Amino acid sequence: MPAKGRIIRVTGPLVIADGMKGAKMYEVVRVGELGLIGEIIRLEGDKAVIQVYEETAGLKPGEPVEGTGSSLSVELGPGLLTSIYDGIQRPLEVLREKSGHFIARGISAPALPRDKKWHFTPKVKVGDKVVGGDIIGEVPETSIIVHKIMVPPGIEGEIVEIADEGEYTIEEVIAKVKTPSGEIKELKMYQRWPVRVKRPYKEKLPPEVPLVTGQRVIDTFFPQAKGGTAAIPGPFGSGKCVDGDTLILTKEFGLIKIKDLYEKLDGKGRKTVEGNEEWTELEEPITVYGYKNGKIVEIKATHVYKGASSGMIEIKTRTGRKIKVTPIHKLFTGRVTKDGLVLEEVMAMHIKPGDRIAVVKKIDGGEYVKLDTSSVTKIKVPEVLNEELAEFLGYVIGDGTLKPRTVAIYNNDESLLKRANFLAMKLFGVSGKIVQERTVKALLIHSKYLVDFLKKLGIPGNKKARTWKVPKELLLSPPSVVKAFINAYIACDGYYNKEKGEIEIVTASEEGAYGLTYLLAKLGIYATIRRKTINGREYYRVVISGKANLEKLGVKREARGYTSIDVVPVDVESIYEALGRPYSELKKEGIEIHNYLSGENMSYETFRKFAKVVGLEEIAENHLQHILFDEVVEVNYISEPQEVYDITTETHNFVGGNMPTLLHNTVTQHQLAKWSDAQVVVYIGCGERGNEMTDVLEEFPKLKDPNTGKPLMERTVLIANTSNMPVAAREASIYTGITIAEYFRDMGYDVALMADSTSRWAEALREISGRLEEMPGEEGYPAYLASRLAEFYERAGRVVTLGSDYRVGSVSVIGAVSPPGGDFSEPVVQNTLRVVKVFWALDADLARRRHFPAINWLTSYSLYVDAVQDWWHKNVDPEWRRMRDKAMELLQKEAELQEIVRIVGPDALPERERAILLVARMLREDYLQQDAFDEVDTYCPPQKQVTMMRVLMTFYERTMDAISRGVPLEEIAKLPVREEIGRMKFEPDIEKIRALIDKTNEQFDELLKKYGA
């Protein structure tokens, strides 16, 4: 009979209950009136300590606790693949349908669908003898993976009944087994297994078959074995964040620095602090702007985040944008293809000069803003910010000054002053006087109440020229109001250069200049900003050019409207081929297609004509009305630690930056998941921030399985347990994931399990241990941290599975560690390194130099090199180990020589050592460096890897021979084959790469003849 008790104490995720006589360790219980899911982790008499997997806020002493009689288990059967679960295997999509985006407490749902029918094909017949692990049937779970229905461990006997081939739910009995004792066991298509107990197998095999990933630095230098264990550090510093001075457009606060936004919202909701990171899930989401369905529109931000980064990337563009983000923050590039506008997310560290990034051209929306007039009693004021008030503000901000009791506007254009005076009378019922003050005319309006009203709108009383910024109310207004302000402001501080066909506005206020670009975006106008220094003071030139832009402000320009700024990256060739229309038809529309086929950029106005002909009007009139592609002119790495910030939005992007830009709200793990020759992938997002996990949930479904062309999700199970979910569920998620991986291993599949990150899991152990008041170990982690980590990684392995037939399966575990500040000496990393056999050390310096994968060849290691050597020698090349070791020796020697070069310079080295530097550089650039975004180089099969290595080793051996015979190194460096070796990674034909060996030998033979050697 299940135990029934009462809560006597609640402390965070831990609940203590008494009256639990008969309960067992690790038994699942239902806690409180809501029936929250928990697990007993300590028993003392009839008292039970329970870790609760849901938020415990509101639980009170006296509420009931009821045992279930079963331990924390997972359901294993058809329906696992493509699923997304939380840490205790609740299907998130089903929970969302039941309770919305925020999961209600006490809610549960079966992990596997009960009503879905699966096509079952029997593999045994009545009378067959079976044991645990035997396959009794198959189900095509996805188009990639066949699910093997197995006899659960511990059951054996004779098949007395088996279902015919057909459609069945997992709840239907598909077989009956008569055990030796005469008991009849009914088998369904699914089974349950406790997550803290490893699934049994017959025999553990040595890890001697490599898990081929197609990544040269891994497969050749630091191989992972099937059934092996590896660790990789998470991204250095923080995630996808921006600099604290980044402006962000909000409805509540106007244009505000993101660090100031964080301070305003800090703690206004559920706050979480972990190490140097902190974030708040907002009680009341704020409104920002983002890219959605081809337009820039209002969206909600639900979280604000603050962290730290060890370095930043600063990107400058042609229009004057300056973007400072973390290296892995994503920006948007794109181009128009025959399928429409294709936007691609590119990490900042991959951006280079000449690239074009998507920025904001037009921000939709806006409504008349109601003004707070409650404190204004002595003058009349408009109830809303209308066109006339906006125009008046333009005159005041452009040429005005607020004195204690007077509004003064200075301009020698008397008609402008009269217009401002007319508006003052109409809007406020006060009139001024136009006077001559030395060299300039002035409109003086004596009204302290008007001064107070204008200050309330944010217009500074002193030093206005350097400190003014665009009022929040203007940024939220409709285009007609914005246009009235802009035209008035230009009349004061602007200048139309007829010869250049552009309007130039000069201001001393940095925030004012950037605010103007946001206002112009409300009109669909883009501008450029340039800085200039006059008499030691910095000024900002806001330049509006282009016929279309000027016409939106009522300025007629006769000159050609092509500015070379608003150009559209177009895949003209593919569109032209798909179109199948003659050249003459396009020429008739004024489109010289040959110019664009040869690489000339197409202006937006030309693209509009082109789009009409090729059926892409929606792209031209919707998407490209709202974004343009700004050219990157400079990229710098800033090597200094600093605070960084982020927000979470529904669109995973937001409008921000000094000028309106689209900003995003990791490649190594994606490459491993996509290309490794594991058949099933289990990804555990353990304690990652919500927006980082969202990236995974978005990116994995987009990845294609390279072998079948089908979505990678068809062979993937995702477990999403973010850092704002209860800490106890984070602890359980690791066990849930490894149990699911073992189940697919038992079918005979090779499984890759990726845990991101085990550091967050260890932090969950630390928090629970602290609440249990256990004796702490190093840095507050529990004393049993090492044994728990070992227990997890030891469940990896390549095994002979249970069952009558010989079946081999494997679970390879790759755990990400996220040490604060990249500190590899902290306890989680050190204890992990004692257990795992492979460590891929990510190097921030390599990432800065755009060397990817950024795995450091001097600090990484693999203890599987000896074990997988025979496989490489038998299946690929008997020289693999010799070449690999020689290459490693050269790279290590290069590091030693570089220390000498730093002191005495390269010229002091002997020829042979300079030759080593040359070949080591070729190894780094032509072999280790690999382009994840290149169609060919993204995956390098084993045969290609050894062929490339043989080419490089041939070049090395011939170089050393030539040097010993007196050939100058300068002559060797000039050999034409070097350039071809540099391109071989992009060559798909292995025979063409192999031909470089003969070419290398021929060119060295000629060189030796030339020098008579």
UniProtKB/Swiss-Prot annotation:
UniProt-listed PROSITE patterns: ATPASE_ALPHA_BETA, INTEIN_C_TER, INTEIN_ENDONUCLEASE, INTEIN_N_TER
MF-aspect GO terms: ATP binding; endonuclease activity; proton-transporting ATP synthase activity, rotational mechanism; proton-transporting ATPase activity, rotational mechanism
UniProt membrane topology term: Peripheral membrane protein
GO cellular component: plasma membrane
Principal subcellular localization: membrane
Record field: catalytic activity: ATP + H2O + 4 H(+)(in) = ADP + phosphate + 5 H(+)(out)
Keyword check for Transport: yes
SUPFAM superfamilies noted in UniProt: C-terminal domain of alpha and beta subunits of F1 ATP synthase, Hedgehog/intein (Hint) domain, Homing endonucleases, N-terminal domain of alpha and beta subunits of F1 ATP synthase, P-loop containing nucleoside triphosphate hydrolases
Domain DOD-type homing endonuclease: 392-525
Enzyme Commission number(s) from the entry: 7.1.2.2, 3.1.-.-
Gene3D superfamilies (alphabetical): 2.40.30.20, 2.40.50.100, Bovine Mitochondrial F1-atpase, Atp Synthase Beta Chain, Chain D, domain 3, Hedgehog/Intein (Hint) domain, Homing endonucleases, P-loop containing nucleotide triphosphate hydrolases
Family annotation (Pfam families): ATP-synt_ab, ATP-synt_ab_N, ATP-synt_ab_Xtn, ATP-synt_VA_C, Intein_splicing, LAGLIDADG_3
Other information: The intein interrupts the ATP-binding site.
PANTHER family: H(+)-TRANSPORTING TWO-SECTOR ATPASE (PTHR43607:SF1), V-TYPE PROTON ATPASE CATALYTIC SUBUNIT A (PTHR43607)
Family membership noted in the UniProt record: Belongs to the ATPase alpha/beta chains family.
Quaternary state and interactors: Has multiple subunits with at least A(3), B(3), C, D, E, F, H, I and proteolipid K(x).
NCBIfam families referenced in this protein's UniProt entry, alphabetically: intein_Cterm, intein_Nterm, PRK04192.1, PRK14698.1
Descriptive protein name: A-type ATP synthase subunit A
